[in-house]
From Swiss-Prot:
Name this polypeptide is given: Single-stranded DNA-binding protein 1
Top-level taxonomic group: Bacteria
CDD domains: SSB_OBF
Taxonomic lineage from the root: Bacteria, Bacillati, Cyanobacteriota, Cyanophyceae, Nostocales
Residue intervals of the SSB domain: 3-102
Keywords from the named record: DNA-binding
Subunit structure, as described in the record: Homotetramer.
Pfam families the UniProt entry points to: SSB
């Protein structure tokens, strides 16, 4: 038996990059900053990949700074470096579930007393 489940909550680092394909599929990529327990630690950054309806929701409602929760799986994108010919790879979270967190005011760029760091 094998399990590949990733659950993250954090702030979006870039506005969603949406691509529409002739097949009708929709792909969205964005970055997510997830804080560590200590405020002195730098956040961990993750690349997220969303498809179809989930990608459309992200494109319509998620912006840089949005607080979101995601559940998905870890995959690796692989390619050959054009200059050196070296095989490279990078981890990507393939998102299956997207949750928009925080208040409407938080999503619209205002401040909120209900931000997770205040709990």
């Amino acid at each position: 038996m094998s399990i590949n489940i990733v659950t993250l909550v954090g702030r979006v680092g870039t506005d969603p990059d949406i691509k529409y394909f002739e097949s009708g599929s929709v792909k969205c990529r964005l970055t997510l900053a997830v804080n560590r327990r200590s405020k002195n630690d730098k956040p961990d950054w993750f690349t997220l990949e969303l498809w179809d309806k989930t990608a459309e929701v992200a494109g319509n409602y998620v912006r840089k700074g949005s607080l979101i929760g995601v559940k998905g799986s870890l995959k690796f994108d692989s390619w050959s470096d054009r200059q050196t010919g070296v095989n490279r790879s990078t981890p990507v979270i393939r998102v299956d579930q997207l949750e928009l967190l925080g208040s409407k005011q938080d999503r619209d760029g205002g401040s909120s007393d209900f931000a997770p760091e205040n709990f």
